[in-house]
């Protein structure tokens, strides 16, 4: 857990430099725990438009998102609608950190109703993420709040 002190949507001046500095702090925390990337950043929906603001006045047309994506090892930034406001997850995208467990592959289910006059379909699957950690309880996920 890395505490940020100021939320990204509360920063008035120098917002771009502050956010990039905090992302670099997340990266260093991951490196200190021996997780070397590649990483994915997950943000709440209240940060989505903030990352589309200009990085600074000297580089108009360059957004904060574009500046973050220039940091080595960061593969992408995704919005998680259900992530609480002012929380950021920095996740190493490897099978030793997180993997997808498939309980049931993609299936089509078909049935008939109303005297075989109406055919209905549903598609279902069972998939859950499994968060993993090493024997020292390090998980490769850095939480910024």
Model features per residue range: what roles?
Residues 1-7, 30-43, 114-128:
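Long, contiguous amphipathic alpha-helices that act as assembly "spine/axial" helices in icosahedral shell
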Residues 1-25:
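Alpha-helical scaffold segments that mediate packing/assembly in large oligomeric complexes
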Residues 9-12, 40, 89:
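Intrinsic disorder/low-complexity detector
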Residues 16-19, 34, 61:
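Hydrophobic alpha-helical segments and helix-packing faces
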Residues 20-31, 64:
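Short secondary-structure capping micro-motifs at structural edges
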Residues 29, 33, 71-74:
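Surface-exposed polar/charged interaction patches
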Residues 43-47, 93:
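Structural motif
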Residues 52-145:
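Sequence/fold signature of self-assembling virion shell proteins
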């Amino acid at each position: 857990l890395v505490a940020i002190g100021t939320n990204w949507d509360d920063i008035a001046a120098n917002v771009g430099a502050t956010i990039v500095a905090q992302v670099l702090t997340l990266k260093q925390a991951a490196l200190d725990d021996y997780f070397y990337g590649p990483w994915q950043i997950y943000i709440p929906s209240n940060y989505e438009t903030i990352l589309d603001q200009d990085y600074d006045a000297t580089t108009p047309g360059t957004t904060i998102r574009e500046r973050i994506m220039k940091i080595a090892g960061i593969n992408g930034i995704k919005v998680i609608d259900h992530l609480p406001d002012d929380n950021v997850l920095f996740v190493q995208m490897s099978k030793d950190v997180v993997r997808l467990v498939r309980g049931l592959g993609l299936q089509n289910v078909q049935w008939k109703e109303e005297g075989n006059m109406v055919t209905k379909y549903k598609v279902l699957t069972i998939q859950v993420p499994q968060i993993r950690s090493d024997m020292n309880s390090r998980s490769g996920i850095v939480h910024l709040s």
